Amino acid sequence: KAVAVLRGDSNVSGVVRFEQTHESEPTKIFIGQNSILALTVVVHAGTDDYGK
């Protein structure tokens, strides 16, 4: 299971896509180009690219 919590202004919209090629691979979270973030976060064992 994957869950994303995104916060932003009421006019922010977009698509979030989760991708995992294999159960042992990290989950990639793609945040659409129309979002204010416009980035991809790769989750490794409970952390993100930023080590949180």
Curated annotation (Swiss-Prot):
Catalytic activity, reaction form: 2 superoxide + 2 H(+) = H2O2 + O2
SUPFAM superfamilies reported in the protein's UniProt record: Cu,Zn superoxide dismutase-like
Entry's localization field: Cytoplasm
GO MF, any single term: metal ion binding
UniProt keyword Oxidoreductase present: yes
Binding note for cofactor: Binds 1 copper ion per subunit.
EC numbers for this chain: 1.15.1.1
Sequence positions that bind Cu cation: 44
Protein keywords: Antioxidant, Copper, Cytoplasm, Metal-binding, Oxidoreductase, Zinc
UniProt KW Cytoplasm keyword: yes
Cofactor(s) for this UniProt protein: Cu cation; Zn(2+)
InterPro entries, sorted: SOD-like_Cu/Zn_dom_sf
Domain of life: Eukaryota
GO cellular component: cytoplasm
Family of this protein: Belongs to the Cu-Zn superoxide dismutase family.
Quaternary structure, from the entry: Homodimer.
Purpose: Destroys radicals which are normally produced within the cells and which are toxic to biological systems.
Protein name: Superoxide dismutase [Cu-Zn] 2
Native source organism of the sequence: Debaryomyces hansenii
